[in-house]
Each structure stands twice: as C-alpha cells, then as structure tokens.
Amino acid sequence: MKSLSRAALATGAAVFALSMLPATASAQSGGDGDRPSGLIQTETHTQVREIAPAAGAAMTVAATSASKQLNYTQQVQQYDQWCWAADGSSIERSMGGTASQAQFCAAGKGTSAGYCPNQPAQIYEIVRGFRGTGFSAQDAGGPIGFSSVVSQIDAGILNLTGIYWTSGGGHAEVIYGYDSANQSIMVGDPWPTYQRYQTWNYNQYRSNGQFRWNDTIVNIRKG
C-alpha cells in the first residue's frame, strides 16, 4: 500500500494552512517525497516528559484557558538543512530577539559570525544557538506531555520540536499554541513547500506513519 503524503496525513490530522510563504531559491524542494532533513537524532526518547515553566516566567492567561495562541511568525528556511536555524531565529524574533538564521546557525555550530555551513544540527547545538544569541533554553530529553505544552504556552514560551521520519532523517518545527477542547497543538514549519502554520491532534503528532516526535527544546527565554 502506498504511504500517505505528509499533506494527506496532515489533512487527516486536522492540519490547515493559515498562510503560505514563497520558497527561497536555495531551499526549494522537489516535492513531498523530498523530505527535509536538517536534524540529527542522537538518542531515542520513548518517555513523555512533563516540564514546568522556568522560574520567573509570567503566566499570560488563566490556567483554565481552553486555548491559547502566541504571536509567532514562522520564517522559511534559507537553506535545505537550516530548519533548525530558521526556527531558532523565528522564535527569538517573536520573543524580542534580533538574530538572523545565519547568526543563529553560527552560534549553534560555533563558527565565525559571517559564515555557517548548510548542515543539519543536533539538539545540543540548537540549545547552544539560543544561549549564544542572548537566550536561555533547555533540552527536555524527549517529547512533552499536552499539559506541559499548555503550561509552556500559557507562560508565553515557544517550544522547538524535533521530529524524525520513519524513512530516516529529521526536521525541526515550533509549537506556538494549543486547543484543549480537542487536544490539538499549533505548529510552525519552515520547509518551503509545507504548510507554514498547522494544527495537529496531539497524539497523532506524537507518532504516526511518517514521523515520530522525539525531542523538545523548552523554557526558551530572552536574557
């Protein structure tokens, strides 16, 4: 049986696009079969983590809020292996930072400010990218529970996720909202031909026929 495309799977998971941005010349995809692969998996995490917001994070809505969506603008990645750099820059700019994709990439890879290779990253390098550009961040060591998504978003914190294709390779996305009524999460994606803003059922995002959520960077804060 032919496997479902990500677009078809997304439709089945109540995924929809709020906007579409044009592809850049250096990050164009050949189609849905050409999967983004800008993330390197170093460990397999099977345990769902429950993570409290970092000390000092301000709760922005009441704990009983049914849904919450943070103000977030998802950039398109400038190179085919820069999903993580696009997400890092997008998160920081949405939270008051100024780092470009190239600057975030250089901080994560430890290269000079004017140069960063088009290479995939490991989670620790993305955490280093945040810390090297004036932010703090924490590796959760796995996917986080829906209640942790709620508490992070309610505290005004965007989360970077690492998903890994069953066919190999990985991709970075960003959680920017939730809806408790149907246990769904709102996800930003930097790949040029994918829907920029999506909504996924939490359990289906955790694991499905095409990918598995394995990593999360949480408690991302400026300063």
Predicted regions and their residues:
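Secretory targeting and sorting signals
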Residues: M1-Q28
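Generic detector of short, well-ordered, non-transmembrane alpha-helical segments enriched
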Residues: L21-A23, Y79, H171
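Conserved active-site-adjacent core of cysteine acyl-enzyme catalytic domains
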Residues: S29-A57, Q103-G223
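Acidic-glycine-rich active-site phosphate/pyrophosphate-binding loop
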Residues: G56-S65
